[in-house]
Design a protein with these regions (language model features):
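N-terminal membrane topogenic signal
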Residues: 3-19
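C-terminal ends of transmembrane helices
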Residues: 3-6, 54-67, 110-123
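Short, well-structured hydrophobic secondary-structure segments
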Residues: 35-66
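Non-cytosolic membrane-interface motifs at loop->transmembrane helix junctions
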Residues: 39-43, 70-74, 122-128
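A generic hydrophobic-segment detector
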Residues: 106-147
Length: 147
């Protein structure tokens, strides 16, 4: 059985995470304001964010104790899938890509719920992730609606 991770998040994560929503909200507003590049910039930022979410799992797998090595394939697979979906979202038509990014960001949070239940992620991280993921997905959908 995996050991439970410390559930305390570093203070910077509690500030920098919400700050990461500023570009999402600004770019979604830019789409509605008619800024020509805003939708593409929103998709690019969403893809970058989604790839980052996957990278979290690579970091966890690299520092996991040997007793947790059985989770390596699961963690590393979860680390790769968001980047692949982000890339796909950028080569699809913008209207499809924005929707895919919103779903993938929420989907990654859903999978992380399972990881948290298995003790692979701290519970406080998951709470913050759902708040941030929901807000990011809402901004992506708002941008999509503004096309």
């Amino acid at each position: 059985m995996c050991r439970r991770m410390d559930s305390t998040l570093p203070a910077p994560a509690k500030l920098l995470g919400p700050a990461g929503l500023i570009p999402f909200a600004s770019l979604a507003a830019g789409v509605w304001a008619g800024w020509p590049s805003a939708a593409w910039a929103l998709a690019a930022y969403g893809a970058t964010t989604l790839a980052f979410l996957g990278a979290v799992h690579w970091g966890l797998a690299m520092r996991a104790p040997s007793s947790e090595r059985g989770a390596d394939w699961w963690r590393l697979g979860l680390g790769v899938m968001p980047a692949l979906l982000a890339w796909l979202a950028l080569i699809l038509p913008l209207s499809v890509g924005l929707g895919l990014l919103a779903l993938a960001i929420l989907g990654t949070a859903a999978v992380e719920t399972l990881a948290t239940r298995a003790g692979l992620l701290p519970e406080e991280y998951l709470r913050l992730r759902w708040i941030l993921s929901s807000a990011a997905a809402a901004c992506l959908v708002a941008g999509l609606a503004g096309l």
